[in-house]
């Protein structure tokens, strides 16, 4: 889909660049595949703010997207339509399966209404088809990749994202992610062929603060603009640079500080995403 720009008849339209969604389905989602979503506003069960600068925004309905692709394995599905989903950057596709049953899946690039998709142990290497990643040839572009067998896709799910198979060894597949990281994934984990739809999402410009508010994002205050009681960077006479290395409001280093602590899965990372930056 293309990008839309506007004549600058108002200040916000001058900078506005959005994705043209005129080809998407304009009706409501399938009721059986949706459920209500309660906005937390960044609060936890105690009502305390755990994520700052969240709240408000348009009310949303949660679409139940099939990330596992195992329930209708072996059944050929037909893409009924491509829909907008407010809960993610990618588009979703409504698939109807022979013998009955419908599901939403992440819409891959170049998949349109009327196309046929299928999942199973051995299926064609065609965008939208899902199968164990160990059965795909080296060089295949994939998305919605499982990290645990049967748990559902976890890698490469956002708009325009994909991973590439670069090797196979001893039941594991080596994937190259968009970040530059190379990672081992078990060969029985499912993945979907192709790249995720809406690659132009990276080029949008919201044009005004209010459009960010519609998405549920509140103003992000800088620490150097606060008082000393509110932030380690706060205070000082006149404008200051903060006077120290960047830290969070609680004093922990930020802006580049490594926070990964999951040593249990370090063995699956063949090449770190930080290596290419050196």
Swiss-Prot record:
GO terms for cellular component: large ribosomal subunit. It comes from the Bacteria. InterPro entries: NA-bd_OB-fold (IPR012340), Rib_uL2_dom2 (IPR014722), Ribosomal_uL2 (IPR002171), Ribosomal_uL2_bac/org-type (IPR005880), Ribosomal_uL2_C (IPR022669), Ribosomal_uL2_CS (IPR022671), Ribosomal_uL2_dom3 (IPR014726), Ribosomal_uL2_RNA-bd_dom (IPR022666). The keyword Cytoplasm does not apply. PROSITE patterns: RIBOSOMAL_L2. Keywords: Ribonucleoprotein, Ribosomal protein, RNA-binding, rRNA-binding. GO terms for biological process: cytoplasmic translation. One of its GO terms (molecular function) is rRNA binding. Residues 223-278 are annotated as: Disordered. One of the primary rRNA binding proteins. Required for association of the 30S and 50S subunits to form the 70S ribosome, for tRNA binding and peptide bond formation. It has been suggested to have peptidyltransferase activity; this is somewhat controversial. Makes several contacts with the 16S rRNA in the 70S ribosome. Belongs to the universal ribosomal protein uL2 family. Part of the 50S ribosomal subunit. Forms a bridge to the 30S subunit in the 70S ribosome. NCBIfam families: rplB_bact. PANTHER family: LARGE RIBOSOMAL SUBUNIT PROTEIN UL2M, RIBOSOMAL PROTEIN L2. This is Large ribosomal subunit protein uL2. It comes from Methylobacterium sp. (strain 4-46). The lineage of its organism: Bacteria, Pseudomonadati, Pseudomonadota, Alphaproteobacteria, Hyphomicrobiales.
């Amino acid at each position: 889909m293309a990008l839309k720009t506007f004549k600058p008849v108002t200040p916000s339209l001058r900078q506005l660049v959005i994705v043209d969604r005129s080809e998407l389905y304009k009706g409501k989602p399938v009721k059986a595949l949706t459920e209500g979503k309660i906005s937390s506003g960044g609060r936890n069960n105690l009502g305390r703010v755990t994520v700052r600068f969240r709240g408000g925004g348009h009310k949303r309905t949660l679409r139940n997207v099939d990330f596992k692709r195992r329930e209708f394995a072996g059944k050929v599905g037909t893409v009924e339509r491509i829909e907008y989903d407010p809960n993610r950057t990618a588009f979703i596709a409504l698939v109807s399966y022979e013998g009955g049953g419908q599901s939403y899946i992440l819409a891959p690039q170049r998949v349109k209404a009327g196309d046929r998709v299928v999942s199973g142990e051995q299926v064609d290497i065609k965008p939208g088809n899902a199968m164990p990643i160990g059965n795909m040839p080296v060089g295949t572009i994939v998305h919605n990749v499982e990290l645990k067998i049967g748990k559902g896709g976890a890698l490469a799910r956002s708009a325009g994202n994909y991973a590439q198979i670069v090797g196979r060894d001893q039941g594991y597949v080596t994937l190259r992610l968009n970040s530059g990281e190379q990672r081992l994934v078990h060969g029985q984990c499912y993945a979907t062929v192709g790249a995720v739809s809406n690659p132009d999402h990276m080029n949008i410009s919201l044009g005004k603060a209010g459009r960010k508010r519609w998405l549920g994002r509140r103003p992000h205050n800088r620490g150097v603009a606060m008082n000393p009681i509110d932030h380690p960077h706060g205070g000082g006479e006149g404008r200051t640079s903060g006077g120290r290395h960047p830290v969070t409001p609680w004093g922990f280093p930020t802006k580049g500080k490594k926070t990964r602590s999951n040593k249990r899965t370090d063995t699956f990372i063949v090449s770190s995403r930080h290596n290419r930056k050196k």
